[in-house]
UniProtKB/Swiss-Prot annotation:
One GO cellular component, as annotated: membrane
Organism annotation: Saccharomyces cerevisiae (strain ATCC 204508 / S288c) (Baker's yeast)
Membrane-crossing segments per the record: 58-80
Protein name as it appears in the record: Putative uncharacterized protein YFR052C-A
Major localization class: membrane
Note: Partially overlaps HXK1.
Annotated membrane topology: Single-pass membrane protein
Amino acid sequence: MDGLVTQAKIQLRLFQLRMVQVQVLLLLLHCPKKELPKVSLLVSLALNEKNVMKYKCVFPSLNIIILMSDALMFFLRSSICKYRHTHIYIFMCIILANKHF
């Protein structure tokens, strides 16, 4: 029974990951080209939670990263995260979603 539950959780996470990727692609279509270098810089710095706090001072509009970072860090440390670019998709999704909504 435990194996089935674990498998179901993995499937759910894979589905959520695909949804995030689609969301990111849609948001990237609306992201001005001049903003993309800033976004990739934010992605690389956001991987360290201490840096996220520093970034909040520079870009106050990025509050959503702070609110979601605990859940994301749990996701990133989980076994499903053998996908190399998962964190980039997620953080870009958050950064861009925050810009546009």
